[in-house]
Amino acid sequence: MNPQSNITISPIGEFSSELIEAIAGEIKRVFGFPAVSEAVLQDLAFALDQNRNQYHSTLILEQLAANRPTHAIRVIAIAQVDLFIPILTHVYGEAQLGGTACIVSTYRLNEGRGGSNISQKYIDRIVKEAVHELGHTFKLRHCPEHSCIMHYCRNEEDVDRKSDQFCRYCQVMLADEIKRMKIL
């Protein structure tokens, strides 16, 4: 692995250092890469759909990938805005399958929707969804195993129910993809 290789966390908006450090720690634990925090995008106005009052996540992914730092093998944006793709009312995140960019929104994962106090449950949700979306960038698809971190979640309760681990099958697929990429 190139010593410069990392996964870049790009906060869009203000986030606690506690949350960013939790995401970075889990990235290192799960994927084996150091994570650094660096602003890649700052203004998402280009992705705002005025009719829906939501942000089109695919447009954001395109810009993230185009502006990915050269030292980053992947970039994950963390945003406080409400995301959507045209076929769904909202998404917690989106990723380029086998690509270099993904995004997670905290907007719908925050119990109580607001306030400056962040709970451990909120941090756990964001961390799980960050690992889930990064998993897609390593070619992992949604998993039918309900406890697997790659399981598709329709609501906050689904996120809370799934574990923070890959099932055996997804773990093997991830290890194979990382080995194939000759990164680790």
Where are the regions a protein language model picked out?
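Divalent metal-coordination and catalytic microenvironments
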Residues: 76, 135, 150
